[in-house]
Every structure is written in structure tokens, then in C-alpha cells.
């Protein structure tokens, strides 16, 4: 009989839990929580993601099927749909956002020496957004059009390893240019983006390659100093 650790527990061992605990403390995630801690919440959702669960009911049924083994997987609290739904609704999302950023930074280090087909030593990023449709009756706060709900996912992808280095979720109506105000540019890096991000008021400090069809007016030419 196998007496070793479950594969899930072995995977979770690689997580920087000291950063997670720090985030929980910073945002008081476990304040007045008695049974289902932030750690339980994260482990349940991580398990759901890794095993392709599709609903809260699916998560509940799957985890309850291995109820005697949950302790060895690190899950101490009782798992139910209502508990998961309440945690998803009430818990401070910044706990998991900060932890996700720490995981992303760890993953990027694993691919930092990976060669690009373009033979560039500098970091190359791809910036884009995608609109995710939502059922308006279930998500009334995400109104996009009269009878349609949506949110927009803005992603900055590090092409070494194809790892997202920056992620923002906004209202579906938010213009793509919004993300340029959120980004902290990396010196010497290349950013690949489509024409939706063309805005001279934001990009005048950058060297960029534009489309031949672009229409612009030069209001003033400055002589090079020195």
C-alpha cells in the first residue's frame, strides 16, 4: 500500500506559503473565521482548477468523495457549496492576487534563460485584452450592452515561457488604453500590441513602430541638443 503523500499535496509543497500567510494577515483574511480558512479556500480552488471542475457542485461532490483524505491534502475545513460561494463572495481578492503575483514571479525565473525565435536578449512582452461574455441574469453588475454582460481581461504576456506577468480584470466597456496607465514599463524591453493601444499622448516617450496607414500631424520639431 502506498503510504506516501498525495500528488496534490506534493504540488502544493512548492508554493511560497510564507507569502500567502503574509497576504492573509495584511488583508485580515481570517478575521472572525472559525472553520473555513483562507488556506482551505485556496486549496479547494486550486484543486478545482487542476482537476477541471466546472461548478461549485462539482467541486463539492468531488472533494466529498475523498473526505477522509482531505486532511492529508491540507484541507481542514468542511467543504460545501454554500461555504465556497460565501468565501468567493466575501473574501478579499487581494489576498489571492498578491499570492498569484508571487507565483508568477517564481515561474518567470524558470524560463528567464529560454531563447526566443527572434534572437533577442531583451524581454519581449505581448499586450492584449479579451472580452469574456457573462450571463446578465447571473451577473447583473457586469452589464456590457442592453441584454449582454461581460468583463474584460487585460494581459501582459512574457513570451519567454508564455507566462502572464500582469493581469487586470475590468468592466467590459473599459478601453484598452486604460492598461497603459497601469503598467510600469521595463527599461529596454519590447512590447508588442495592436493598433487599439495607439495613443501618442501616452506613447510619446517610447520608440515604436507604427502602421503605414496611421495619420498624424507633427506640431513641432525639436533640434537635437549637443
Task: Annotate each predicted stretch with a short phrase.
Residues 1-226:
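Conserved, well-structured functional cores that handle cations and Mg-NTP chemistry
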